[in-house]
Swiss-Prot record:
GO terms for molecular function: oxidoreductase activity, acting on paired donors, with incorporation or reduction of molecular oxygen. It is an enzyme of class 1 (oxidoreductase). NCBIfam families: PRK00142.1-4. It comes from Nitrobacter winogradskyi (strain ATCC 25391 / DSM 10237 / CIP 104748 / NCIMB 11846 / Nb-255). HAMAP family: TrhO (MF_00469). SMART domains: RHOD. GO terms for biological process: tRNA modification. Catalyzes oxygen-dependent 5-hydroxyuridine (ho5U) modification at position 34 in tRNAs. This is tRNA uridine(34) hydroxylase.
């Protein structure tokens, strides 16, 4: 059984271009495959390998000399795969690690209020809470939380247009949002706060952490959670979907 790690952190990496090759070499040395994005604003990736290989990579990212302690708050989610879910290893340089297209939005300055999975059901059941799914439309089709609004985004960058047209900080006082692993909510919640919204919450660890920690008997989630690798989707307990698909490139949620 292989170990899959979804990881990200918003943190200044002015030397991100110089980090690309040593990071690629580190992953290759451990036969790790998947995709990692580097940008001046941080790191975002999903990778797979043996448990020992993934543990070695995570240890280096968090405490090794390569990032010099800048990833000590790395957001991590682990799951399993019965076979290698990625075709190759890619370490890419990007303008953003998740593409919103608004340079003024900075999650290192302000983000919404994190809500642990154990407290999520109570929040979304609260009257007047607007529940937003900030994933792409093809992901929402496979599963969502009961009562969630689907903004019908073809790509994450369209969230700005949705917010401008459909959300009003004077009318929508409390907003709760979620995504696969949490990274898109970091950007989306930061964006809404900069537009005058006061109460913005997001699911800590995303859908994946919720499915890992919340028993199916207590869950408000319906369907499966799409993931960007050959497993296609995960269910409660992070069990692999039975749906078949060709091996994907393993692109993390950058758009």
């Amino acid at each position: 059984m292989l170990k899959v790690a979804a990881l990200y952190q918003f943190t200044p990496l002015p030397d991100f271009r110089a980090l690309r090759e040593p990071l690629r070499e580190l992953c290759a040395a451990h036969a790790i495959k998947g995709s990692i994005l580097l940008a001046a604003e941080g790191i975002n990736g999903t990778v797979a390998g043996t448990p020992r290989a993934i543990d070695a990579l995570v240890s280096e990212l968090q405490t090794g000399a390569l990032f010099s302690g800048r990833l000590n708050d790395l957001e991590l989610k682990f799951s399993q795969a019965s076979a290698m879910p990625f075709a190759r290893l890619k370490v890419r340089l990007k303008k953003e690690i998740v593409t919103l297209g608004d340079p003024a939005t900075d999650p290192t300055r302000a983000v919404g209020i994190y809500v642990d999975p154990q407290d999520w059901n109570e929040l979304i059941a609260t009257p007047d809470t607007i529940l937003l799914d900030v994933r792409n439309d093809f992901e929402v089709v496979m599963g969502s939380f009961e009562g969630a609004i689907d903004p019908q985004l073809a790509r994450f960058g369209q969230f700005k247009d949705f917010a401008a047209q459909e959300l009003d900080h004077r009318k929508h006082r409390r907003i709760a949002m979620y995504c696969t692993g949490g990274i898109r909510c970091e950007k989306a919640s930061s964006y809404l706060l900069s537009r005058g919204f006061k109460e913005v919450y997001h699911l800590k660890g995303g859908i994946l952490k919720y499915l890992e920690q919340i028993p199916e008997s207590e869950s408000r989630w319906r369907g499966e959670c799409f993931v960007f690798d050959d497993r296609i989707a995960l269910g409660h307990g992070l069990k692999e979907s039975r749906q078949a698909s060709p091996v994907m490139d393993g692109a993390p949620h950058d758009d």
